[in-house]
Amino acid sequence: MENVVITVVGVDKPGIVAEVTKVLAQNSANIVDIRQTIMEDLFTMIMLVDISKISSDFSELNVALEKLGSEIGVKINVQHENIFKYMHRI
């Protein structure tokens, strides 16, 4: 398995989860775990996604998600799991 961590943050509105998961499905990525919450009007989501069988390469998926974030008004970050864990260790 090759996992990435995807974080999504922005003002809450309908369709954010649907749009992000649509891009992942179109690229044959598999959601391993997902957590999402709304804090007042702030949408936050973190996903663990297996990209070992994606139909594109990592950089193409990253660009597609960044473009989607711009289109729907949220910030989407994609990091390999080991980098995410290293950056957020205590």
UniProtKB/Swiss-Prot annotation:
Domain of life: Archaea
CDD domains listed in its UniProt record: ACT_1ZPV
Alphabetical list of SUPFAM superfamilies matching this protein: ACT-like (SSF55021)
Domain ACT: 5-79
Gene3D superfamilies: 3.30.70.260
TM segment ranges: none
Residue ranges that the Swiss-Prot or TrEMBL entry lists as coiled coil: none
Family matches, as InterPro entries: ACT-like_dom_sf (IPR045865), ACT_dom (IPR002912), UPF0237/GcvR_regulator (IPR050990), UPF0237_ACT (IPR022986)
Record family assignment: Belongs to the UPF0237 family.
PANTHER family, sorted: UPF0237 PROTEIN MJ1558
Entry protein name: UPF0237 protein MMP0657
